[in-house]
Amino acid sequence: MSNSLLILGSTGLVGGQVVKFAQTSKDFSKIFTVTRRKPEFANTASTTESPRIDTIVETDSSKWPQAISNLEPAPLAYISAFGTTRANAGSAEKFKEIDYGINYESAKAAKEAGAKVCVLVSSYGANAKSPFLYMKTKGELENAIIDLKFPYTIILQPGVLLGERNESKGFGNDWAVKFGKLCKGTWFAPLLQPIEASDLGRIAVEFAERGLKGEFRENVLKVSGSELTELVDDFKIV
């Protein structure tokens, strides 16, 4: 296949896994990543970057939309696993600027460039009416992405993400991850809906592939919590 894929957030826990599984896909001949720093792709077979991957390093994220507009061939599928936390951003305003602003403008640029499928990694409990900043921002972003009207928009709403991170996401998130590991597979799992980042990355790539093949009846799909964990055994991209 001659389809190209754009991945945002490739230096993160989930994004690195998206890159890993995209490399095994037969549906993408070209994989673009746009990032502030050159990523160390997670668990790749070798330390050499795949020739199918083109990494655009741009330290000024406000220039990412223009960089996306200039991609050749234009990506037909777009996956965003990009995001941060208030603790890492430093303030509520900066958090929204990163988590909502960069995500929205990049998705808009991908849509205008011709992308047919958008897969957004959001969060379990995302709700634009939530009193909590994180959930509210995620919900607002979901609504804004849906309003862009990609032919297919798939929103993944995972619970606690399990896996080895390169940096802390703040005390609250670190605590949730530790508890999520303990409760995975137990009766307490529905509280946090834990999922391995590798499984979520695999699922994101699978949805992008299926979207390009027109396998969905609905234009907008939301897959949340336990629905994602149920897909782990169904989606096999290995």
Swiss-Prot record:
Topology in membrane: Peripheral membrane protein
Keywords annotated in UniProt: Membrane, Mitochondrion, Mitochondrion outer membrane, Transit peptide
Cellular compartments per GO CC: mitochondrial outer membrane
Highest taxon of source: Eukaryota
Subcellular location: Mitochondrion outer membrane
Stored Gene3D superfamilies: NAD(P)-binding Rossmann-like Domain
GO BP terms in the entry: import into nucleus
Protein name per UniProt: Protein FMP52, mitochondrial
Organism for this UniProt entry: Lodderomyces elongisporus (strain ATCC 11503 / CBS 2605 / JCM 1781 / NBRC 1676 / NRRL YB-4239)
Protein family (similarity comment): Belongs to the FMP52 family.
